[in-house]
C-alpha cells in the first residue's frame, strides 16, 4: 500500500512499523516522535524486545482509535524449541531444564497443537505486563518472586505447523498463529512443550498482522526516518477497520455535537462519514439510538 507523505503540519493517521528486534515498543514510539515531530503518539499492542513485525502507531487524533485496535485479533509467525524450558519462556531467559525430544513424533506434535486450538483457557506468561497487586508480573518475576496468574479465556483460530527441524535432543518447529487479543505466544510454546512432556520455549516471534494492518503496509524505522509518511490517514484507517454509514449534512452536525441518531442496523462499531468520506465519529447502535464510541471530528473543529 502506498504511504501518505508526512511532514510539518501533516494530518492525523496510522503508521504501520516493522519493529526490529532488540528494541522495546516504547523505544519505537520515542523514535517515531522524533521522526514525526510530535509527542502526541502511541502504539496499539506491545511487542517484546526480541519480537519483530507489525507495531501500529497512532499519530495525533488517531491515538483515539488505538484502544479499539488492542482488542482485535492478531497473527504471528514463531519458532518453538521443544526439549528446553527457560525462566522467561523465550530465548532471552535462563535455561531451567532440558529433556530430550528425540522420541517425539510429528504426529504427537500435531495432536498437541490441535488440543491448543479453538477456545482455550491460557495462563499468561509470568513475565507479562499484567499487574499483580499494583506491580507488573515481569517485575516480580525478575526479583525472584513466584507469580501466579489466573487462566484466561483466549481463542486460537489457527495454530499451524509449517516446518520441523531436529537437532541434538531438541526439535525446532515453525508455526503460524491467528489468535484473539490477550493471547501469549510464549505461553503457547510453554504449554505445547508441557503437553509433550519435554518442555518448550519460544526462540523467535514475528507479528504479521494486527486487525486489518499487516506487513504489506509496514515500513522500517530507517525508511520512515528517510521519508516520514503515514500508512493511512485517520479517515482511511477508520473506513478500513469498520463498516461505513453515510450521513446527511444535518446528521453530520448532530454527530459532531455528540447527539444520538436513529440506529443504522449495523452490528458492532461503524464509521459514520459525510458525503466527502470524512469520518465524523465511530458509532454503535444501542437500542433505539446510537452511542458515540469516538468522536473523530467534533463540531468545534
From Swiss-Prot:
Family: Belongs to the pseudouridine synthase TruB family. Type 1 subfamily.
Protein name: tRNA pseudouridine synthase B
Biological process according to GO: mRNA pseudouridine synthesis; tRNA pseudouridine synthesis
Protein's job: Responsible for synthesis of pseudouridine from uracil-55 in the psi GC loop of transfer RNAs.
Superkingdom of source: Bacteria
Keyword tRNA processing: yes
InterPro entries from the UniProt entry: PsdUridine_synth_cat_dom_sf, PsdUridine_synth_N, PUA-like_sf, PUA_sf, tRNA_psdUridine_synth_fam2_C, tRNA_psdUridine_synth_TruB, TruB_C
Disulfide bonds: none
UniProt-annotated catalytic positions: 48
tRNA processing as UniProt keyword: yes
Keywords, comma-separated and alphabetical: Isomerase, tRNA processing
UniProt xrefs under Pfam families: TruB_C (PF09142), TruB_C_2 (PF16198), TruB_N (PF01509)
Enzyme kind, highest EC tier: isomerase
One term of GO molecular function: RNA binding
EC number(s) stated in the UniProt entry for this protein: 5.4.99.25
Organism: Mycobacterium ulcerans (strain Agy99)
Family matches, as HAMAP family: TruB_bact
PANTHER family listed in its UniProt record: PSEUDOURIDYLATE SYNTHASE TRUB1, TRNA-PSEUDOURIDINE SYNTHASE
Matches recorded under SUPFAM superfamilies: Pseudouridine synthase (SSF55120), PUA domain-like (SSF88697)
Catalytic activity reported: uridine(55) in tRNA = pseudouridine(55) in tRNA
Amino acid at each position: 500500500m502506498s504511504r501518505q507523505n508526512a511532514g510539518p503540519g501533516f494530518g492525523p493517521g496510522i503508521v504501520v512499523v516493522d519493529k526490529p528486534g532488540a528494541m522495546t515498543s516504547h523505544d519505537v514510539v520515542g523514535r517515531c516522535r522524533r521522526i514525526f515531530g510530535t509527542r502526541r503518539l502511541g502504539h496499539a499492542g506491545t511487542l517484546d524486545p526480541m519480537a519483530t513485525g507489525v507495531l501500529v502507531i497512532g499519530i495525533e487524533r488517531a491515538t483515539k482509535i488505538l484502544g479499539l485496535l488492542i482488542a482485535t485479533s492478531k497473527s504471528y509467525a514463531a519458532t518453538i524449541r521443544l526439549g528446553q524450558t527457560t525462566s522467561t519462556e523465550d530465548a532471552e531467559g535462563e535455561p531451567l531444564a532440558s529433556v530430550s525430544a528425540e522420541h517425539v513424533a510429528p504426529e504427537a506434535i500435531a495432536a498437541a497443537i490441535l488440543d491448543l486450538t479453538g477456545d482455550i483457557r491460557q495462563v499468561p506468561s509470568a513475565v507479562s505486563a499484567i499487574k499483580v497487586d499494583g506491580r507488573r508480573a515481569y517485575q516480580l518475576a525478575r526479583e525472584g518472586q513466584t507469580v501466579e496468574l489466573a487462566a484466561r479465556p483466549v481463542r486460537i483460530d489457527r495454530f499451524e505447523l509449517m516446518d520441523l527441524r531436529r537437532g541434538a535432543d531438541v526439535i525446532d518447529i515453525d508455526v503460524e498463529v491467528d489468535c484473539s487479543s490477550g493471547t501469549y505466544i510464549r505461553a503457547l510454546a510453554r504449554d505445547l512443550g508441557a503437553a509433550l512432556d519435554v518442555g518448550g520455549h519460544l526462540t523467535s516471534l514475528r507479528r504479521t498482522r494486527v486487525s486489518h494492518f499487516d506487513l504489506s503496509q509496514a515500513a522500517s524505522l530507517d525508511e520512515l526516518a528517510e521519508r516520514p509518511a503515514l500508512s493511512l490517514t485517520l479517515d482511511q484507517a477508520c473506513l478500513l477497520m469498520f463498516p461505513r454509514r453515510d450521513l446527511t449534512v444535518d446528521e453530520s452536525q448532530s454527530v459532531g455535537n455528540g447527539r444520538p441518531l436513529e440506529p443504522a442496523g449495523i452490528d458492532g462499531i461503524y464509521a459514520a462519514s459525510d458525503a466527502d468520506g470524512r469520518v465524523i465519529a465511530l458509532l454503535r447502535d444501542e437500542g433505539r439510538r446510537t452511542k458515540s464510541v469516538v468522536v473523530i471530528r467534533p463540531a468545534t473543529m
